[in-house]
Amino acid sequence: MTLADRVVVLRDGLIEQVGSPLDLYDRPVNQFVAQFIGTPQMNVALLSTLPAVVQAAAPASAKGGSLGLRPESVHITTDADGIAAKVVLVEALGAETLIYAQTPEGAQVVVRQAQRALFRVGDAVRLQFDLSQAHWFDTEGRTVQNVA
C-alpha cells in the first residue's frame, strides 16, 4: 500500500476498483477488493455463520450476504456478551500478535492485537466486533455499506 498514490485492482483482466491505497482499504467496492488489500486480509464471514446478534445488525440489503471486518476491528473481550470462539493459531510478531479463532458456527476470524498475547491454541475466548467499522456485502459480494 505504500508503493503508489493510485492503485488499480484487476481481476481476470477487468478493473475492479481504482483509487488511493487508503480508499481501497477503507471503501472497497466489493469483497474481492476488500480481501485483496491489507495484511492480514479482511475477515469476511457469511452472515449465516455468525451469531444472531450480528445478523440482526446487518442492513436489509446485506441479508444472506457477508460481514467484513479488518483484524484491527475485532477484539478479545471478557464481556459475557462477546462472541464465543476457540483459538486455532497464534502468530507472535513482536510488537503485535495475530490471533486466529473460529466460532462454533464456523466463522474464521483474525484478531490483530497491539500487544503480546498470552493465548494458546485451544483457548476459549470471547470476541467483540466493532460493527461501526463493518463492511457489508450482498450475496454477490458487492459492497452494500462501508465504514462511514
What are these regions (language model features)?
Residues M1-T2:
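A short, surface-exposed alpha-helical micro-motif characterized by mixed small hydrophobic
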Residues V90-T97, T139:
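Short, conserved beta-turn/loop elements at beta-strand boundaries and strand-helix junctions
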Residues R6, G64-S66, A124:
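Residue-level marker of beta-strand positions
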Residues R6, V18-G19, R27:
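Short, glycine/charged-rich "phosphate-handling" switch motifs in NTP-dependent
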Residues V9-L10, L69:
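Catalytic metal- and UDP-sugar-binding loop of GT-A-like glycosyltransferases, i.e.
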Residues L22, D26-V88, A101-F119, R142-A148:
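ATPase nucleotide-binding modules
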Residues F119-A148:
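Generic C-terminus detector
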